[in-house]
Each structure stands twice: as C-alpha cells, then as structure tokens.
Amino acid sequence: MIKLGIVMDPIANINIKKDSSFAMLLEAQRRGYELHYMEMGDLYLINGEARAHTRTLNVKQNYEEWFSFVGEQDLPLADLDVILMRKDPPFDTEFIYATYILERAEEKGTLIVNKPQSLRDCNEKLFTAWFSDLTPETLVTRNKAQLKAFWEKHSDIILKPLDGMGGASIFRVKEGDPNLGVIAETLTEHGTCYCMAQNYLPAIKDGDKRVLVVDGEPVPYCLARIPQGGETRGNLAAGGRGEPRPLTESDWKIARQIGPTLKEKGLIFVGLDIIGDRLTEINVTSPTCIREIEAEFPVSITGMLMDAIEARLQQQ
C-alpha cells in the first residue's frame, strides 16, 4: 500500500468544490493509498532526521463533512512513499525552511511533489525568463527610471510583485496615467524590492488560461479565467469567471516546449498561465483548477498525477 502524505493549509477551511488538493486526496484514497495529513507546524527536524506529527485521513465528497481523522502518529517522513507539498503561497522563509525538511526525507527515498530544490529555484514569475521566446516583453528591476522607460516604450503595461498570488497587487498602467510613480514606489518599496513589468496583452479579454502539466505532459484541457466588469485580472480570486476549454495549438506548443524542463526538475504538477499565445507565469507551489476542468471534460487530471507518481515510485 502506498503511503501518501500531504502538507496543506487547514483542510477544515477548504472549498471542496474547487480545491485541487482535495481532488488529489479523493483519487489517492480511491486507489487504496493510506493518507497522512500534515500542516506546516507538524514538520520538524531532530538531529537531521525529518519527522512529522501526521493524522491518518479519510475524505469524502460531502459538502457538510468532507474529512475525518482516523488516527495520529509521530513518524519519520521517510516512512511515507510520497509527500504532496500543497501549502499555498506566500513563498516566504517559513516555506523555504519546510522545503529543507522535506529535502531530508527526499534524500532517504521519499518522493516529494514538487521537488524541494526546484520549489526554491523556480520562482513563479522569474522562471519564465528561461523561456523568454514565449513570454511578453518583460523587465525585472528595482529601478523606477527603468520602469518609466519601459512604460514609455510600450505605453500600456502590467506591473506586479514577484511574490504575489491570486492577482494581488497587479497594476495596469496605461498611457498618460499619472500614478506610475507611486505604483513603482509601492511595488519596489522605494527601490528595495524587485518587481516585474510586462507589456499589456489585449488577449486578456479572452481569458488568462491555466494549462496544467503532469510530469511533463500537458493536460489537453485548460481553464480560461475571464476578467469581469472592466477588470484587468482574470484570477478567480480577483472575481474572474472560469471557463474550461480545449488547448489551442499555441497552448500545446508552449506546454510541450516547457514540459521536458519541468520533468527534469522534478516539477511533477505545474500550472502554466498563458494569455493569448504568451506565457506569463509558471506556477509550481500549489497549482489549482483541477476540479473546474474535470467537471466539464472527460479527463482525470488526478488520475494522470497518481499514474505519474506510481511510475516514479517504481523507477526508484
């Protein structure tokens, strides 16, 4: 029997209709895995050994009562076959410390999804720089004068922090906007923090597409998140409307170009953000949108994921 651990935000607070981690747990349980639930505070290191307080978990598709704990134990993380690291951002120092603990278990043979080193290496905004032929024009800087020059060149730009999620602190600055200076000061914290600028992509009106990639293989359907009511942001957390769709030819091209690098880096479950035919982000920490896509199309993304995990476990 495969022992699967998951590190996530409190399961009591999730919306099971939309929660991808919950979808993963349902599929793992359907396959007879033993589920071990952990929150960040349950992980610890003792004399170099990664351990955790885990609670054995049952889940069910019930909106009133979707989980129950059936046991608890303190164990070495190496006792688990696989651990899903599904803690939502912020990607802060606490998150980084947790990846070091998980890495100690990985060294003892536990499969960590996604690979701890790659979680640290692949910032969701900056990692797109390795695929610059696929992205919009992109500037990463702390320098207000550089941001101003970029804006003057493109006249309509998007500014965002490197550590945001859910569309937080994303600004559109159009030609003639008097607020560029204060936005630049806010995002760079007066020149002490990097931010990202990209030329505005009018294709956002048709949606910001979330394309999921499982161990290098693109899922054939995506979720387009369409901005509502004059918004620039399509993020569901910012009020965007989700519309599942088949991948376009350019979606396939982008996902297939990036897929081998993701697989090589142990990034087994990844969400690409694509606007039109441009890659804007590579989400590696806790990608979502499984449930919305599975509800609309005949595809089991969680099945693809568990198949990939089982294949990797057999290779070890």
Curated annotation (Swiss-Prot):
The keyword Magnesium applies. It catalyses: gamma-L-glutamyl-L-cysteine + glycine + ATP = glutathione + ADP + phosphate + H(+). It is an enzyme of class 6 (ligase). Keywords: ATP-binding, Glutathione biosynthesis, Ligase, Magnesium, Manganese, Metal-binding, Nucleotide-binding. This is Glutathione synthetase. Its cofactor is Mg(2+); Mn(2+). GO terms for cellular component: cytoplasm. ATP binds at residues 151-207. Residues 125-310 form the ATP-grasp domain. It comes from Shigella flexneri.
